[in-house]
Amino acid sequence: MLMKTNKLISDLKKSLSSCNVLETLEERYAYAQDATNIKEIKNLPDVVVFVENIEQVQNVVKLANKYKTPIICRGAGTNVVGACSTEHGGIILNFSKMNKILEINRENMTARVQSGVVLGDLQNAVESFGLFYPPDPSNLAVSTIGGSIAQSSGGAKSFKYGTTKDYVIDMKVVMANGEILQTGSNTIKNATGYNLNTLFVGSEGTLGIVIEATIKLIPKPESKKVLMAYFDTVKTAVSAVNKIIEHRIFPATIDFMDKNAIQTVEKFYPANLLTDKEAALIIEIDGFECSMDYQEKIIVDILNSSDASAIQASHNEEEYNRIWTARRSSMGACAKMKPNVTTDDVIVPRKNLEKLVLGIREICEKYNLAVCMVGHVGDGSVHPQIPIDYSDEAEYKRYKLAKAEIYDLTAKLDGILSGEHGVGSLKREHINKVVNSVALDYMRQIKKTFDPNNILNPYKIF
């Protein structure tokens, strides 16, 4: 085994610049985990490779086939389901050097980018053209477009604008045999053959290696404003969500924080949040400047009629950023409570939101676990963030039991286990709770057809 690995590394150095091949124990350890930090993952990658162009990616694929070695693609490693973890060793294929925005076309309203482009950089670049790329995961300051495509990530604005899958119109993909596949076209509509874009978006690097993508853009909204409404019960908060939608007002976001999340954020990252409230909604409105007062009035009236106990509104960019920074700081705040923190991404139809939130709280209380809940409740998504100590074996066992029950509850409420994080290795043992066996069999057949040697991120999803 060691001899094979040494030969692989030697061949990689011949194909790539030696400075782009990392092989020391310390270097490999740094890339063995992603943001999930799964306790069970013990194996290190055999080698870490930084690629700079398509030809180098093809060379790595050729060698992976030769040595029957897994390839695990990595952008910033921010995913939280173990999709970048190295359970079986292999090659970490790092795309941080393929980070060029190749083209922004104002007329077509598209951008062509390499996989390593950081989402926040892309958003800032297109906004200078008066354009807008809506998907906005909380880690957009560091996460990459390649990772977003792999996990089909969304964010707060997915309620109004959709997720990554709604904006990818074309990709260049290096297949497991080294061929380059073009999945779509440079047009906004395409009904010419199968839609291969939707096959690769969310495939977690198991079907092919996305090296370049063409992204659909939309006009940048003229104005935006955020409201933070507090409630004395989860029930009234969830009820307000449905009332807003029923009134045909479509905010850019309707996000949620429960009392634990509010208090934890305020403790570690003070933001003038009201810590005595049971829940809060973060509602962003956008559009033409002339429509903002009307939208705000309608929503405030609905919130007041829904028993909102307090409403904070942004009147300038500083206040806007304060509210959103507080919401996005929840995970970081939870991380200060214990050595480890886990998050999740369960989603149910909105009619079952209250049952999901209260059910998760009951499960965590049953197993004596703290939980902070945030989420994009406009589309039914909840992120339970559980701070734990992996070195406490008893607590970790309780955590695993609680997770299984949370997934059972989600399935019972007609939900799914991931709306935007993916499955990875963390949820694969539970996927059959929400995906039927026939669908899973077809997924496995697709995987085998695209990757007969099982070298592309093996043992992820199922």
What is the meaning of each model-derived region?
Residues 179, 428-462:
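Activity-critical C-terminal alpha-helical subdomain
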Residues 1-62, 78-109, 261-270, 317-343, ...:
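N-terminal flexible segment immediately upstream of the FAD-binding catalytic core
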